Amino acid sequence: MRYDILIIGGGPIGLGFARMMAPTGCKIGIVEKQPAEKLAAAPDDGREVAVTHRTHGLMERYGLLPHIPEKEIHILREAEVINQGSPSSLHFSPEDSDKENIGYVISNYHLRRAAYKAIQDCDNIDLIEGTVSALDLGRDEATVTLATGKKLSAKLVAAADSRFSTLRDMAGIKTDKLDFKRLCIVCRIEHDKSHRNIASECFLNGLTLASIPLADYTSSLVLTMPQDKGEDVLALGDDALAEKVNAWTEKRLGRVKIAGKRHAYPLVGVYAQSFSAARFALLGDAAVGMHPVSAHGFNFGMYGAQTLAEIVTGAMLNGLDIGSPLLLQNYTNRHRATTRPLYEGTNAIARLYTNDRPLAKLVRKGILTAGKMLTPARKVLVKTLTQEDKAS
């Protein structure tokens, strides 16, 4: 079976890229190991996604947003960073922009369901259930072999198969990996004080605690800690964990109770050394797997999908080869310029704030104090969060 574009991975970025390319009329195949019914009813995995204004605009433009219940799109009005034992904190507010908020929060499973629904009316998109066993990047076309032995070919293969991408390995693209040797634990909590739509990131001794505002009096709790301590937390009963959270938060949200199942994820940062090869491109976490402290992974995935869609669409309109190495190198260059500074900055901050040596603690306090005074830098970051889709 021949396609113009083959996308490996039916997550929101892979499906989103397919939806962006659908108006060109090109023939698109999406290979996904899960059956369609599981994509349509993606389960709650506990993860909440911070969505920038630009990403929100892309979701609206390409038909994802209408498939998400309005009550499940939560306002992110402000964000604050707190360091235990420091009187200083760092605030990010819409006062530094022309918006009423700095973004939105949407559950990952709603994004997955919406992306699946957004492609249902696209006659030029095929969803193929299967697992890739081999990849051949030829001069004139790429060939993907499925575990069943079935072969699919395309002018371009785009891999959106997670930060642990097997397609990336098959293409021979190396990565810079940073294993934080930590566990990220997420669950919903209820509390008797309003969160006021403010996200909070608090760095404590030995762990990081974030609360992400959802419906009022409900938040998503995100804990990152060493693997062994994380296993201990997972073994606690709900009441015992709630008491620990009350102590860690100093009851800033009032009394807290655990209101959902706990989910745990290993914490690994990944940055591909190239985002492309001949007839091949990386999307989403397969290209850039961010530390969750950045809250920017999904946004970077959508930005990358938009960039690649613009480049490939332009090539089609001009009769150019969409799998050309030079063409795809343009995608690598543009997406690297968008992602590299925040990726490196986030990792540096994460390393600093998970280091409990006295010198590191002193530096942390100094950064928060300086950050309060560096108003121009803070405004630049808020502007990045609140910028809109340039084509919307």
Give residue spans per PLM region.
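FAD/FMN-dependent oxidoreductases across multiple families
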Residues: 231, 235-323
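Glycine-rich FAD pyrophosphate-binding loop
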Residues: 22-47
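N-terminal glycine-rich dinucleotide-binding loop that anchors FAD/FMN and/or NAD(P) in oxidoreductases
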Residues: 45-69
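C-terminal helical "tail/cap" subdomain of flavin- and related membrane-associated enzymes
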Residues: 310-392
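N-terminal Rossmann-like FAD-binding beta1-loop-alpha1 element of flavoenzymes
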Residues: 3-30
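Generic enzyme active-site microenvironment
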Residues: 30-31, 159, 283, 290
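Conserved N-terminal helical subregion
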Residues: 60-61, 66-68, 72-170, 178-183, ...
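Conserved FAD-binding catalytic core of PHBH/FMO-like flavoproteins
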Residues: 59, 143, 157-254, 260-262
